[in-house]
Amino acid sequence: MSQQNVTKVGLRIDVDTYRGTRLGVPKLLEIFQRHDISASFFFTVGPDNMGRHIWRLLRPAFLKKMLRSKAASLYGWDILIRGTLWPGPIIGKKLAHIIKQADDAGHEIGLHAWDHHKWQMKTDVMTPAELHSEIDKGYQLLSTLTGKPIPCSAVAGWRCTDATLEQKQRFGFRYNSDCRGESIFIPQLGMAPQIPVTLPTYDELVGKDNIDHSNYNAEIIKLVNPDGLNVYTIHAEVEGIVCAQLFEELIIQAKENNIEFVPMIELLDHEDIDWPLDEILNIEIDGREGWLSHQASMINKQKSA
């Protein structure tokens, strides 16, 4: 690929579950090796209790999303019941070898969560001590597996609070990716920069506005901004399993459109840049149930447009 006019897209892989780690990550590693791509993996390493989300089906917005994305066939029934009748497996202990494979392949390794379900459901009510414990348990296990400090993190479910930011700062992350947005920013003076996710995920697009597998990739490519920040999140449970072929086709089409997927650290460019200050707002968006964290300036622009 010619480096002239290449648009870089930070590629973030969220690994939420035991199934995604066991099946999705190895498949993605194969795809990345075939296409000479380096990316950023964010691992959940604690108990897989994601089946406990089944109670959220009582909420209309969550049920609508599950039906639209055909969740049972997309994620697998084992994910949908994991951790409901008994505690889920500790992913980082059961599947340590797979996490090490991703690290050995040269990909950037970051922390997603200790307990993804707990973080997504309780982060806004946890005490500072509880928040620190959740981050610390994940950090310690993941750094033990890789044998080095963990350079970055991305909260589960894009759910971040001021208290979360304060606790994260204690771990010395080079950057965090905790929200949706449009540009890199500093949430508070002295804090690590935020690299927000700019593009929608598979389950947010498919089934809406006549978007299906036949035109999904074209829609993602259309949304890439050649003049701005681009960060795309995939999930090991989706693009690494059921949608692996669709994702590999996206990689091929991206190359044809002079788009290059890169690890997120490459988007920072220089260590000495003074990133602008901005805030994180927690609001609800169409396509997802509950609140998500967003870059404040982007929301303000949308409101004034």
Swiss-Prot record:
Alphabetical UniProt keywords: Antibiotic resistance, Hydrolase, Lipid A biosynthesis, Lipid biosynthesis, Lipid metabolism, Lipopolysaccharide biosynthesis
The keyword Nuclease is assigned to this record: no
Cross-referenced InterPro entries: ArnD (IPR023557), Glyco_hydro/deAcase_b/a-brl (IPR011330), NODB_dom (IPR002509), Polysacc_deacetylase_ArnD (IPR050248)
Residue stretches making up the NodB homology domain: 7-262
Catalytic activity: 4-deoxy-4-formamido-alpha-L-arabinopyranosyl di-trans,octa-cis-undecaprenyl phosphate + H2O = 4-amino-4-deoxy-alpha-L-arabinopyranosyl di-trans,octa-cis-undecaprenyl phosphate + formate
Domain of life the protein comes from: Bacteria
Gene Ontology annotations of biological process type: 4-amino-4-deoxy-alpha-L-arabinopyranosyl undecaprenyl phosphate biosynthetic process; lipid A biosynthetic process; lipopolysaccharide biosynthetic process; response to antibiotic
GO cellular component: membrane
Enzyme Commission code(s) on record: 3.5.1.n3
GO molecular function annotation: hydrolase activity, acting on carbon-nitrogen (but not peptide) bonds, in linear amides
Keyword Secreted: no
Pathway: Glycolipid biosynthesis; 4-amino-4-deoxy-alpha-L-arabinose undecaprenyl phosphate biosynthesis; 4-amino-4-deoxy-alpha-L-arabinose undecaprenyl phosphate from UDP-4-deoxy-4-formamido-beta-L-arabinose and undecaprenyl phosphate: step 2/2; Bacterial outer membrane biogenesis; lipopolysaccharide biosynthesis
Pfam families attached to this UniProt entry: Polysacc_deac_1 (PF01522)
HAMAP family: ArnD (MF_01870)
Similarity comment: Belongs to the polysaccharide deacetylase family. ArnD deformylase subfamily.
Protein function: Catalyzes the deformylation of 4-deoxy-4-formamido-L-arabinose-phosphoundecaprenol to 4-amino-4-deoxy-L-arabinose-phosphoundecaprenol. The modified arabinose is attached to lipid A and is required for resistance to polymyxin and cationic antimicrobial peptides.
Record protein name field: Probable 4-deoxy-4-formamido-L-arabinose-phosphoundecaprenol deformylase ArnD
GN (gene name): arnD
